[in-house]
Amino acid sequence: MSFAREASRAIRSSFVLWVIAAVIYPFFMIAVGQIVFPHQANGSLVRDSRGQVLGSTLIGQPFTSDRYFNSRPSTTVYSTANPNKDDNLVLQTGISGASNLAPSNPQLIERIKDEDLNRLQTSGIQPTADLVYTSGSSLDPHITPEAARAQVSRIAKVRQLPPQQLETLITQNTDSRFLGIFGEPGVNVLQLNLALDELKPT
């Protein structure tokens, strides 16, 4: 075979593969996602009754009010920033990631003692691991059921709700292990707090 014929065959093969891999396959996956999993494919957004986006079940938010179940600490403040002073362009690019400090690192210990422990103790909360340590991405939307239950007394007092009602709410909003064996049970903080707002004081 001549060089020209071999080169032509290689070019045609590359073009066909490019069309399949860069055009057909991506559009096929987009179509499948929009038809079969439209909610997940569009970011698992949570909206209120007016259609206003409140957040995503996949990305955590910095809940810190005593009226709500608090989120895990985040080294990136859940990729939020002041729109008027966003020097790091967080709102344009988004950031994630933990501090990568070892459990014995003095800087981490100081942060936990000075910030998280003081805040939790002031609120009368027994600290759990996920209430003082960040997740690997610093964007985790979940806390453990134990971390949620540790906050029941504070929220019950502030909202004048019976603790047992909050315990039931936590149980109702706890995600079990995937397929019953993978991962650990978790509570999505955004969904839990939205359900909390629907409760009425007794």
UniProtKB/Swiss-Prot annotation:
Domain of life: Bacteria
Keywords linked to the UniProt accession: ATP-binding, Cell inner membrane, Cell membrane, Ion transport, Membrane, Nucleotide-binding, Potassium, Potassium transport, Transmembrane, Transmembrane helix, Transport
Positions of transmembrane segments: 17-37
Keyword match Cell membrane: yes
Major localization class: membrane
InterPro entries: KdpC (IPR003820)
NCBIfam families listed in its UniProt record: kdpC (TIGR00681), PRK00315.1 (NF001454), PRK14003.1 (NF010607)
Family: Belongs to the KdpC family.
Assembly notes: The system is composed of three essential subunits: KdpA, KdpB and KdpC.
GO molecular function terms listed in the Swiss-Prot or TrEMBL record: ATP binding; P-type potassium transmembrane transporter activity
Subcellular location: Cell inner membrane
Source species: Nostoc sp. (strain PCC 7120 / SAG 25.82 / UTEX 2576)
Example of a GO cellular component annotation carried by this entry: plasma membrane
Stored Pfam families: KdpC (PF02669)
Its membrane topology: Single-pass membrane protein
Function: Part of the high-affinity ATP-driven potassium transport (or Kdp) system, which catalyzes the hydrolysis of ATP coupled with the electrogenic transport of potassium into the cytoplasm. This subunit acts as a catalytic chaperone that increases the ATP-binding affinity of the ATP-hydrolyzing subunit KdpB by the formation of a transient KdpB/KdpC/ATP ternary complex.
The keyword Cell membrane is assigned to this record: yes
Protein name: Potassium-transporting ATPase KdpC subunit 1
